[in-house]
Swiss-Prot record:
Species of provenance: Saccharomyces cerevisiae (strain ATCC 204508 / S288c)
Region (Disordered): 1-87
Assembly and interaction partners: Interacts with itself. Interacts with MPC54, NUD1 and SPO21/MPC70.
GO MF entry, a single one: structural molecule activity
This protein's record includes keyword Flavoprotein: no
Biased composition (Basic and acidic residues): 69-83
Function noted in UniProt: Involved in the pathway that organizes the shaping and sizing of the prospore membrane (PSM) during sporulation. Probable component of a core structural unit of the scaffold that initiates synthesis of the prospore membrane.
Protein name: Sporulation-specific protein 74
Keywords: Cytoplasm, Cytoskeleton, Sporulation
Record GO cellular component, one term: spindle pole body
Lineage top rank: taxon: Eukaryota
One GO BP annotation of this record: ascospore formation
Length: 413
């Protein structure tokens, strides 16, 4: 039985049982020697019908015997070549040995069997292979540094931290709430202690309490906070203007005391008796009218409180007389200051130093003129310029209305 017919038979049968476990061991030499006698006996013996199992066993035995006979022939040929190689003095390992031939013979046999093919030569299915591949873990700490290798650990800085902008904003908000609100509250307390700004301070206090205690919309809260800051800025501007005005007035009032001026008797009419009685107070009534009610206010002048404070000339055309309508001492009538020049005013009024500001509208921004008469030195001119400049910085619409008595009384103290 040839090897081709053996393989065809094995492929048809598909090896229902595993060929690895069913192959028998090599038969004994005695059974091989009696091969011829067994063949003769089979010829002489009557023919018997073989079952399917007997045929399988006989085919298996035939394959094993054929393999053994082939190995025996190879062994005999190798011995013959060994003797020939000894005569030729060739290398002993130049021809394949018996074990190598047996290994190749068994390898070729087992690789051609159907069981080996089904077990070790299955085609690769890509779909089943992809199913076994797990999803890789994404690396989130991807470094964009151009330097290769592992970077050394560094402490987080102001620009490297991921939450720098958020934390910085939180710190700024906490700083504003703790420090700015405290500053505004203290400024409002200072405004409440101020006499001319008390009413404005009360309004600022109401806004501050509304911002602090009531839960309002963010935009409205920011609006209130901006108004408070603007009010405080206005308060400081007005306070500075009032301080400059007060300093200028004090310099002006102290100027005659620092100079060696002649006595008041030199300017007095010698025919008038000396009256040592004190001057009447402001609220004293004469002829049914007070000192302020005796004279009318001009239409184009006002003081820094928004009230008209300049006095107009009397009906008879003379200068205002202060104590009695029948006063003997009368001065010459003069024109208003706005309708005459400086030289004419000095010529007609010898006491122009006392009335130089009569009729001047300071609040409307009229610049001060330079009077270079006797007794007007540089310090006086600077003080007067500062006084007129401070009047222009005051907003009359924001000032509370007060009477003349209150105004004059607090400024003198």
């Amino acid at each position: 039985m040839g090897a081709g017919t053996l393989l065809n038979g094995l492929e048809k049968e598909n090896f229902p049982n595993n060929i690895h476990s069913d192959l028998p061991a090599y038969p004994n030499m005695d059974s091989q020697e009696d091969g011829n006698t067994s063949k003769e006996s089979k010829r002489n013996s009557p023919v018997k019908q073989k079952s399917q199992k007997d045929e399988e066993k006989s085919s298996k035995m035939g394959t094993a015997s054929n393999i053994f006979h082939e190995n025996k022939d190879i062994h005999e040929r190798s011995e013959h070549t060994d003797d020939f190689n000894d005569g030729l003095k060739l290398a002993p390992d130049s021809s394949p040995s018996l074990k190598e031939c047996q290994f190749k013979n068994w390898e070729s046999f087992w690789c051609n069997t159907e069981g080996y093919k089904t077990k070790h030569m299955q085609p690769f299915h890509f779909t089943s292979g992809l199913e076994e591949i797990k999803e890789p873990v994404m690396e989130l700490n991807i470094s964009t540094s151009p330097y290769k290798g592992q970077r050394p650990n560094s402490a987080p800085t102001e620009y490297s931290a991921a939450t720098t902008a958020f934390t910085k904003t939180q710190l700024e908000v906490s700083f504003l709430k703790t420090n700015l609100l405290t500053y505004i509250k203290k400024e409002i307390d200072i405004c409440l202690s101020s006499v001319p700004f008390f009413d404005d301070a009360v309004q600022m206090q109401k806004k501050f309490l509304e911002y602090r205690d009531i839960d309002l919309d963010e935009e409205y809260e920011l609006k209130i906070l901006g108004e408070l800051l603007n009010d405080l800025n206005f308060f400081h501007m007005q306070e500075n203007s009032l301080l400059n005005r007060e300093l200028a007035v004090r310099r002006f009032s102290n100027q005659p005391e620092s100079q060696n001026l002649p006595s008041i008797r030199d300017f007095r009419n010698p025919l008038l008796p000396i009256d040592n009685r004190p001057s009447p107070p402001l609220g004293l009534k004469r002829n049914g009218k007070s000192f302020e009610e005796t004279y009318d206010f001009t239409s184009n002048t006002s003081n820094f409180w928004g009230e008209k404070a300049e006095l107009q000339n009397s009906i008879t055309g003379g200068t205002p007389y202060f104590f009695h309508p029948n006063n003997i001492h009368q001065t010459k009538p003069f024109m208003s200051f706005e309708n005459q020049n400086e030289l004419l005013f000095q010529r007609k009024n010898s006491d122009y130093k006392q009335h130089f500001n009569s009729g001047r509208n300071i609040h409307n921004g009229v610049e001060s003129k330079s009077y270079r008469g006797v007794g007007l030195n540089d310090s006086y001119q600077k003080g007067y310029a500062a006084m007129t400049k401070s009047f222009g910085n005051i907003d009359l619409n924001r000032m509370p209305r007060r009477s003349n008595e209150e105004m004059y009384s607090w400024s003198r103290n």
